[in-house]
Amino acid sequence: KVGNLDSMRTWSDVRDAVRAYYLLVTSNPISGEYYNIGGTHTCTVRKMLEHLISISTCKDIKVEIDPERLRPIDADLQIPDTTKFTSHTGWKPEITFEQTMEDLLNYWREQVKSGRRYLNR
């Protein structure tokens, strides 16, 4: 069950985000300044899901739109401007979208294999 598949998102790996936060706190941040961090790969939620399904060993996946997962207001496109953060810290995303999706899928394969399931939906 999914929500809006047509929303565009800029995907980033949490490992890149953690590295960004670390760089920020260790780079003498300017008090009161704000910084945007984010990935560089932009695509629809549908394309992300199609990619996950394409690298999955399970091919009979049924995708169902769940009205309860649709947001009343949903930004069609979200792209962070990381210019200021990059110039201040030298940070840029290192982990590709494809690697992130593969690692995500492998993580959940291990969860299922070990009997640990954290999603109740």
Residue ranges of model-derived segments:
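Amphipathic terminal alpha-helices
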Residues: 97-121
